[in-house]
């Protein structure tokens, strides 16, 4: 055969494409290693065969290969464009994509794409969307029928050894798959319980409003463009704040971790938390408002620039000079980040359980720290599962909301203190105990018995003492039912108008099932908080 080949003919890779093993043997025995007539060098037979098999490995000589049709470089992976290591399962691929395809087929994994199966797969983000990566493996030529069954002898031996250890160890153990599910469920139940606590307070508030019967509800649409006709007065603001302080105590008593603490430690947490609670709640309630702060009683504190001329003087001299800071530093971030209900209740509970609150006992510090860690872990898990694309959301919520909260709440406490010392308004004992705890005045009162301080009232009016935190914490809350009437009985719901506007008011403690008020005309109970939220409870939140 070699004697009949023209001396000027030279084999090229295109000629070698059709060679098989038999032809390679013929070439090996037929070709001469010396050039005929000394004109053209003859191809080395061993190099020809080596080149042939190398082409088979890289797909150069495969007529079905995509490398010839689409011009792809066989040195890069056709899936992620990383450095290819050869043909794996029918496609030019790297070791990473080869292993990914093998694991997916062997373990019957099912993936789903969140972006309409249009993810771009490259070596930098190939692990972002497994569905699109697997589909690209298939479109690049990988075949699942070429994946052999798993033959991991070492892995089987390790599994047998682990089984022997498990059988010999008297301590029961569970696999990670079994232990993760209860933890995930516990986190979900924790957030649900926090929402239930909000529902408990809402149910209590609705019950009292129904029994009172004279609370003023707004007659205008919730989507009204103007709310200047609902501008709050100083008396309205203090009434709303007083009611919110009463309800936050009842909210705290619905939390199991809070009830494990002693009465003294509970009072410490509430004094540290009350001002931040008022600020955080009014900010979250104002997310749906139009450049204003919305109070519990459905009234508004507008910006100074939004007020009418006859209200300008009132706003300029208003004690809440930091209202606009709350709008800018809390309301706007909440609106921008679209803070939802579960995130809000989780952040609120984290603020309550502050392990560095001054005055906590050593035993309470560990309990409070564990409670905060547990709630924050549930918060992180919720964000990770429900908002996976916002990888920095936990940090954004923490820094943009919780960071300015403490500073703003202390500023508001100082504003309230200013109204007291300037004689603009009288502040009741409950506010002094909770809101003014962070001010110099509150620190001077630490050695005084809470309810021994009677508020001055005008002549002719009756002296009275607002319920202090210690008294409210001692009330009975034996049942955890959201609609339990004992909650209504335990809460001394009243608004001390004498402490705010100089008008004497009498009240009686509501009794179980039939709460009664001696003078309900002076009662200004809070409306449902978070009116722009909690859509999952349409019958409760208005």
Curated annotation (Swiss-Prot):
It is found in: Nucleus. Pfam families: Hormone_recep (PF00104), zf-C4 (PF00105). A zinc finger (NR C4-type) spans 77-97, 113-137. One of its GO terms (biological process) is cell differentiation. Residues 475-487 have a biased composition (Low complexity). Its main location: nucleus. SMART domains: HOLI, ZnF_C4. GO terms for molecular function: nuclear receptor activity; RNA polymerase II cis-regulatory region sequence-specific DNA binding; zinc ion binding. Residues 74-149 bind DNA. Residues 445-487 are annotated as: Disordered. Keywords: DNA-binding, Metal-binding, Nucleus, Receptor, Transcription, Transcription regulation, Zinc, Zinc-finger. It comes from the Eukaryota. GO terms for cellular component: nucleus. SUPFAM superfamilies: Glucocorticoid receptor-like (DNA-binding domain), Nuclear receptor ligand-binding domain. Orphan nuclear receptor. Belongs to the nuclear hormone receptor family. This is Nuclear hormone receptor family member nhr-35. It comes from Caenorhabditis elegans. The gene is nhr-35.
């Amino acid at each position: 055969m070699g004697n009949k080949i023209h001396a000027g003919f030279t084999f090229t890779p295109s000629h070698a494409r059709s060679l098989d093993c038999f032809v390679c043997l013929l070439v090996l025995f037929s070709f001469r290693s010396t050039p005929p007539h000394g004109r053209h060098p003859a191809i080395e037979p061993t190099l020809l065969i080596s080149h042939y098999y190398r082409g088979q490995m890289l797909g150069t000589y495969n007529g079905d290969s995509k490398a010839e049709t689409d011009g792809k470089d066989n040195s890069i992976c056709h899936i992620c464009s990383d450095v290819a290591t050869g043909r794996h399962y029918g496609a030019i691929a790297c070791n990473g994509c080869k292993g990914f395809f093998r694991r997916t087929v062997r373990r019957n994994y099912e993936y789903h794409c969140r972006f309409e199966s249009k993810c771009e797969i490259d070596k930098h983000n190939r692990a972002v969307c497994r569905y699109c990566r697997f589909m690209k493996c298939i479109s690049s030529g990988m075949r699942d029928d070429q994946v052999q069954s798993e033959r991991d002898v070492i892995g089987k031996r390790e599994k047998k050894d682990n089984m022997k250890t498990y059988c010999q160890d008297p301590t029961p153990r569970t696999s990670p798959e079994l232990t993760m599910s209860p933890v995930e469920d516990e986190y979900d139940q924790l957030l649900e319980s926090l929402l239930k606590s909000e529902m408990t307070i809402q149910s209590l508030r609705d019950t009292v409003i129904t029994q009172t019967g004279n609370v003023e509800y707004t007659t205008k649409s919730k989507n009204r463009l103007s709310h200047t006709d609902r501008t709050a007065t100083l008396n309205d603001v203090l009434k709303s704040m007083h009611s919110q302080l009463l309800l936050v105590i009842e909210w705290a008593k619905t939390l199991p971790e809070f009830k494990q603490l002693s009465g003294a430690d509970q009072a410490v947490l509430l004094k540290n938390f009350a001002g931040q609670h008022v600020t955080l709640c009014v900010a979250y309630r104002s997310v749906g408002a139009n450049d204003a702060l919305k109070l519990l009683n459905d009234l508004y504190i507008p910006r100074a620039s939004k007020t009418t001329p006859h209200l300008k003087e009132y706003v300029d001299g208003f004690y809440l000079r930091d209202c606009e800071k709350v709008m800018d530093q809390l309301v706007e971030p909440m609106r921008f980040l679209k803070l939802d209900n579960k995130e809000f209740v989780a952040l609120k509970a984290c603020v309550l359980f502050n392990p560095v609150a001054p005055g906590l006992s050593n035993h309470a510090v560990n309990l409070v720290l564990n409670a905060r860690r547990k709630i924050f872990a549930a918060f992180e898990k919720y964000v990770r599962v429900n908002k996976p694309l916002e990888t920095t959301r936990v940090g954004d919520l923490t820094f943009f909301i919780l960071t300015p909260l403490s500073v703003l709440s202390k500023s508001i406490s100082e504003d309230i203190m200013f109204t007291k010392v300037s004689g603009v308004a009288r502040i009741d004992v409950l506010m002094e105990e909770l809101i003014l705890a962070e001010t110099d005045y509150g620190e001077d009162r630490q050695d005084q018995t809470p309810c021994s301080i009677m508020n001055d009232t005008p002549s002719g009016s009756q002296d009275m003492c607002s319920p202090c935190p210690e008294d409210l914490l001692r009330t009975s809350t034996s049942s955890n039912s959201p609609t339990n009437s004992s909650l209504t009985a335990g809460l001394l719901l009243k608004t001390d108008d004498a402490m705010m506007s100089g008008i004497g008011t009498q009240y009686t403690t509501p009794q179980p099932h039939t709460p009664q008020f001696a003078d309900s005309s002076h009662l200004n109970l809070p409306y449902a908080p978070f009116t722009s939220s909690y859509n999952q409870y349409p019958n409760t939140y208005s």
